[in-house]
Amino acid sequence: KNEAEMNTVVVVVSAMAGETDRLIELSKLFGDNPNKREFDALISTGEKVSASLLAMALNSLGLKAKSYSAAQVSLKTTSNFSKAKILDIDKAKMEEILSDGSIPIITGFQGITETGEVTTLGRGGSDTTAVAIAASLEANRCDIYTDVDGIYTTDPRVVPNAKKLDAISMEGMLELAGQGAK
């Protein structure tokens, strides 16, 4: 890879603090057991708002940025609503997006099925998305910015005896992120 390719930035965003919980509460307006397809369609919107706002903020600073949904980058998942697993990321599509020189701001936490249905990955899904995209692009590194001070075997805010890791491979990180680690 040349120097420009090695310094390319891809941003994966999560919803703003509290937004996913707010959307979950909205989903209960018509009962405690909403349709799973519609539930995922609703709660995936928080990341779309974050991606668009971040792209607007970067553009206002003179940087070229564009927001993309998981569907637009062809991030394919299983059809398990709210607990989908990433099956494939279209590397050619990602490289096409990167080729225009913009900073891609991609929605985390979600994907699409082979039939185009929106699915969500469950809590921690944006971290999973970031690691999966980094792996698909053979990135040198994947930085996760969060409210936790390192990589833990599970969410330390939920499990007090979670263990902090000194180092981890990309494959190991992908596995842990898929299980909700922080």
Where are these regions (language model features)?
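Nucleotide/pyrophosphate-binding catalytic subdomain
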Residues: 1-182
